[in-house]
């Protein structure tokens, strides 16, 4: 995972956070409460991205 881009879209009381691995073009999307810190939002999205990349390796 060379570089990860984050995109934030507010939807009412929630924020949709997308983490994109630029190397594999894999995307992970999480929906979190709007009150969460940016760091926590990124952490949750990154955890899901890592999970998806590991899952992809085993397939």
Predicted segment positions?
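Charge-rich, low-complexity N-terminal segments
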Residues: 1-31, 35, 39-59
């Amino acid at each position: 995972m060379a570089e990860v881009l984050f995109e934030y879209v507010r939807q009412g009381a929630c924020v949709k956070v997308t983490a994109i691995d630029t190397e594999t073009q894999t995307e992970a999307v999480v929906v979190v409460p709007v009150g969460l810190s940016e760091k926590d939002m990124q952490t949750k999205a990154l955890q899901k991205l890592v999970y998806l990349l590991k899952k992809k390796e085993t397939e």
